[in-house]
A protein has these predicted regions:
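Nucleotide/phosphate-binding catalytic cleft detector across ATP-hydrolyzing
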Residues: 1-159, 167-287, 294-340
Length: 340
């Protein structure tokens, strides 16, 4: 990227929980999808990790917002500000002019025309000149290294923060898909509710997320891979006195069971709608898991035991969509039929 470069290409996975930006084949931004705004002026105070540090800790003059809910934009203005702030992180080095942006953005395959328009408008207001949109399961498949143009069926299950995208891909198109608004945020909410009900301890969204990372599991028996208990500190829900509660992975597996079952059922539903020839390919190739939810301990084994088809976790599940979007952007002519 030179001194007089007028066009910069960036690929973005605009996620409910995290936003990832790739430029020049490198991950240049990997930040929480959070923005902090001044209530009086609506000016941005912080974005990404800095804004997340303020989350649930602000006074009346600052509001912290997660602009996306269930994989789609819930607050248009905040999303535009967040995108601007995150894109600014990409502009490093000295240039005479701010470059025009050529962008491709990954979105849920269930997005309505209105939701697609909202993302495109946000990107254009954040200085995007050419804005392409690609559905997340297709981007994830490209990022994993699947030949999406091949005449064979591959199934992708992309579990993000706000939505789970399940798609059967063949010949460069999505043959059948199932998108549910049950994903990582629901697992976090389950843990918050469980800690309050079972242990009488109030935990924040951030603490529930830490519990999920340290002892989250889809199975009650992880064998040798079992994590150590996690100590949770928080106020008693009734007395407000400080508490210290050890939490084990087995109890978290029980509390996440219903949400994981919804994901299982969504995968089964997508398989039911898959043509027999493609179904045979999927049984042979296995099903690919991507997104942050793919990192939940034991999820691949639980799904495999339930569905009797091998499940593979992508090599870099958190970045599969962004990497695939980056490859699509570098090969726009080849992949133009995948983009909107």
């Amino acid at each position: 990227m030179g001194f007089f470069s007028f066009i910069q290409e960036i690929a973005m996975d605009l996620g409910t929980a995290n936003t990832i930006i790739i430029s020049d084949d490198k991950i240049v931004v990997d930040e929480p999808s959070v923005v902090a705004l001044d209530r009086r002026t609506d000016k941005m105070i912080a974005v990404g990790e800095k804004a997340k540090m303020m989350y649930e800790k602000t006074h009346d003059n600052i509001r912290t917002i997660r602009p996306l809910r269930d994989g789609v934009i819930a607050d248009f203005t905040a999303c535009e500000q967040m995108m601007r702030g995150l894109i600014k992180m990409v502009h490093t080095g000295s240039r005479l002019f701010s470059p025009s942006l050529r962008m491709v953005i990954g979105l849920p395959s269930s997005s309505t025309e209105v939701e697609l328009r909202a993302v495109r408008d946000s990107a254009e207001h954040a200085d995007g000149r050419d804005v392409y949109l690609i559905f997340e399961p297709m981007a994830a498949a490209i990022g994993i290294g699947i030949d999406v143009e091949a005449p064979e069926g591959n199934m992708i299950v992309d579990i993000g923060g706000g939505s789970t995208e399940i798609a059967v891909i063949s010949l460069g198109g999505i043959v059948s898909n199932n998108s549910i608004r049950t994903a990582g945020d629901d697992l976090t909410a389950d843990i918050q509710e469980y800690m309050s009900r079972q242990h009488n301890v109030k935990v924040s969204e951030r603490m529930a997320e830490r519990i999920k990372i340290h002892v989250g599991s889809a199975l009650t028996d992880l064998g040798d891979e079992a994590p150590e208990d996690f100590i949770v500190h928080g106020p008693n829900r009734i007395t407000a006195l400080p508490m210290e509660v050890p939490v084990c992975y087995q109890e978290i597996a029980h509390c996440l069971d219903k949400t994981v079952a919804k994901i299982e059922n969504a995968v089964l539903s997508a398989l039911e709608n898959t043509p027999p020839e493609l179904y045979a390919d999927i049984v042979k190739n296995g099903i690919w898991l991507s997104g942050g939810g793919a990192l939940l301990r034991g999820l691949d084994k639980r799904l495999q035991d339930k569905i009797n088809i091998p499940f593979h976790i992508a090599e870099d599940p958190l970045h599969s969509v962004a990497k695939g979007a980056g490859i699509a952007l570098k090969n726009v002519d080849r992949f133009s039929f995948l983009m909107r």
